[in-house]
């Protein structure tokens, strides 16, 4: 499998150069998912043609890729956080896993969980399990 950095670079290039972005391909590649025909159609439904995909074309540009871009928020908000904080990553995450250490090192006492069998799109892969974890976390941290 490709590393997260390589996949991210390919996604940026694809979003910049493609005229009709492959939404299903992105979901399957980044999430490690194999969508059924029905699921694939559901992901494509909001975008009947490439001209409707302006939003997805800018998705990669909305992600801060350098810590310096949001350093002020890390210091002002996260490093001074005094409330419960839940961090969840899929055990097979390849895209954002590099951020895990930032959360562990910079947020005081985060609760960090690893979602077994999940990759990047945890809400798709283990949605009910994730919902229960979030619900329990909220109930146990009023």
Predicted regions and their residues:
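Ligand-binding pocket scaffold of soluble enzyme catalytic domains
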Residues: 17, 46-48, 98
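Helix-loop "lid/cap" segments that line or gate small-molecule binding pockets
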Residues: 23-35, 42-48, 60-66
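Flexible "cap/lid" loop of the alpha/beta hydrolase fold
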Residues: 1-19, 23
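Generic structural signal for small/hydrophobic residues in well-ordered secondary structure
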Residues: 43, 56, 87-90, 103, ...
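Conserved serine/cysteine hydrolase catalytic core
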Residues: 51-105
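Catalytic active-site module of serine/aspartate enzymes centered on a nucleophile-bearing elbow/loop
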Residues: 110-142
């Amino acid at each position: 499998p490709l590393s997260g950095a390589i996949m991210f670079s390919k996604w940026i290039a694809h979003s910049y150069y493609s005229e009709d972005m492959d939404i299903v391909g992105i979901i399957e590649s980044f999430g490690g998912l194999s969508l059924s025909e029905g699921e694939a159609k559901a992901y494509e439904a909001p975008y009947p043609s490439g001209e409707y995909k302006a939003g997805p074309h800018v998705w990669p540009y909305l992600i801060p890729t350098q810590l310096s871009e949001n350093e002020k928020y890390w210091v002002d908000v996260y490093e001074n956080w005094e409330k419960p904080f839940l961090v969840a990553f899929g055990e097979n995450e390849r895209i954002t896993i590099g951020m895990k250490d930032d959360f562990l090192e910079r947020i005081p006492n985060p609760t960090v969980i690893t979602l077994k069998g999940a990759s990047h799109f945890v809400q798709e892969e283990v949605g009910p399990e994730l919902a229960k974890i979030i619900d329990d976390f909220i109930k146990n941290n009023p």
